[in-house]
């Protein structure tokens, strides 16, 4: 009878430990901190070909949109340097992704401007692989803080 009680107690404790390790909680050291719908970092950005190609796509789309907007203004705008010398993609320097109705990427991209200087831009792009869709949502220059 005492042996049966010990076995029952050991099995109960073992079951409790298994549940404690498997159940996600803030106290669980094995749990990865992920917030549903939250942003997560993208590892190995420099060597990640998909992310670098996505950055190049963002710059190309921005250049195309700028060219289309300038072309709609009139013949004077067609001599603008933004059209004859568009931004050149250099590299993606940081990236985060978020699961939405697809994947939303937040990229910080280094570009070379027509005058040869480099500048950072933040871009947002959504990919929906099942629709074969990729859409640039935003492409804005990073403003350096003035101290």
Swiss-Prot record:
Pfam families given in the database record: SQAPI
Transmembrane segments: none
Main localization, broad class: secreted
Domain Cystatin: residue ranges: 87-117
Molecular function as annotated in GO: cysteine-type endopeptidase inhibitor activity
Motif Secondary area of contact positions after renumbering to this chain: 98-102
Keywords: Glycoprotein, Plant defense, Protease inhibitor, Secreted, Signal, Thiol protease inhibitor
One GO-annotated biological process of the protein: defense response
Gene Ontology cellular component terms for the protein in this record: extracellular region
Gene3D superfamilies: 3.10.450.10
Annotated signal sequence range: 1-27
Job of this protein: Specific inhibitor of cysteine proteinases. Probably involved in the regulation of endogenous processes and in defense against pests and pathogens.
UniProt record similarity statement: Belongs to the cystatin family. Phytocystatin subfamily.
PANTHER family noted in UniProt: CYSTEINE PROTEINASE INHIBITOR 2
Protein name: Cysteine proteinase inhibitor 2
Species of provenance: Arabidopsis thaliana (Mouse-ear cress)
